[in-house]
Every structure is written in structure tokens, then in C-alpha cells.
């Protein structure tokens, strides 16, 4: 057993959010290139590009406006973050998840998941669905692992990888 309360007492940086970092604390070393979470598929929301973009850890080198050329874009997360992205991506839809289980079901049922360093991305990693990480230049701790798992710093990378995953 792992006493996760001990994490609060250790002199470690809890801001480091790479999934593999948990292995140092737990002594458990899963194959991060394989699926290590399970859930059901969502019954109603399938085939969307699922987006979660928090205000924290944004990459200010990129712009989401090209997403207006794509369909079935679904934002999950906080409504104020949705409202902010909706100013740029006019065809973006919002869904307020009931809980993290439903969020996982939606991610599992997605065409792929796009996000910055937030809860949705590690869930997508665990479910091993296609995923795209908006890497944060000033805090590049989160890293994708495995097949069809990418990150980007620059606009041309973002657009190329988005198109690739959209057409899988």
C-alpha cells in the first residue's frame, strides 16, 4: 500500500505533473505506452475532438483559430475556460461532465483528445487514446507517451498534428 498523505509531508515539488513522476513516489512502474485505465464508452458523445484547455500552462506561441475549419469539437472542463476559447473557436461545443468517470468515458469515446497540462491529458494517456498536448514552454513537465501521442510548441506543428489525428 502507498500512503499518499505522505506526499504532503515530503520536500518535493508537487507542480511536476509528468505521469511517470508518480513512479518515484509509489514504486509502481506501469508501461505508460499501454493502456492503464479502464472505463466504459460514453453512450451519447462519440467521435468528437475532446478539448480541455486550462488558463494555466498555456502556450502563447499558438492560436486555435484554425479549428474553425473542423467539426465536432467538444470542450470539457470549466465553463469560463470554454467561454475564453469560444471567442476564437466559434463552432466549439460545451459539455459539463457530471464527474471524472463521465469525463473519462467521453475521452475514451473521442476521435482524439487535445489539451494542455490538465486533468484530461493524463486520463487520455491512461486510456491510451490518440492525444495531442499543448506543451507549455515555461513549464514543460507533462510529456506524452506511446503511439499517436504528441506534443507541440509551434503553430505549424499544432496544425500538422491536429490534421493527422483528425484524419486517423
Feature map (PLM): residue ranges:
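Catalytic machinery of carbohydrate-active enzymes
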Residues: 1-168
Amino acid at each position: 500500500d502507498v500512503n499518499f498523505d505522505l506526499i504532503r509531508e515530503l520536500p518535493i515539488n508537487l507542480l511536476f505533473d509528468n505521469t511517470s513522476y508518480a513512479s518515484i513516489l509509489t514504486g509502481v512502474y506501469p508501461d505508460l505506452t499501454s493502456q492503464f485505465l479502464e472505463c466504459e464508452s460514453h453512450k451519447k458523445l462519440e467521435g468528437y475532438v475532446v478539448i480541455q484547455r486550462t488558463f494555466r500552462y498555456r502556450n502563447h506561441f499558438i492560436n486555435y483559430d484554425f479549428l474553425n475549419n473542423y467539426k465536432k469539437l467538444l470542450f470539457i472542463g470549466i465553463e469560463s475556460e470554454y467561454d475564453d476559447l469560444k471567442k476564437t473557436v466559434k463552432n466549439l461545443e460545451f459539455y459539463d461532465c457530471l464527474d471524472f468517470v463521465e469525463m473519462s468515458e467521453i475521452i475514451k469515446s473521442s476521435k482524439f483528445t487535445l489539451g494542455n497540462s490538465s486533468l484530461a491529458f493524463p486520463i487520455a494517456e491512461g486510456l491510451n487514446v490518440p492525444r495531442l498536448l499543448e506543451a507549455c514552454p515555461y513549464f514543460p513537465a507533462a510529456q506524452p507517451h506511446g503511439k499517436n501521442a504528441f506534443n507541440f510548441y509551434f503553430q505549424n506543428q499544432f496544425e500538422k498534428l491536429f490534421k493527422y489525428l483528425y484524419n486517423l
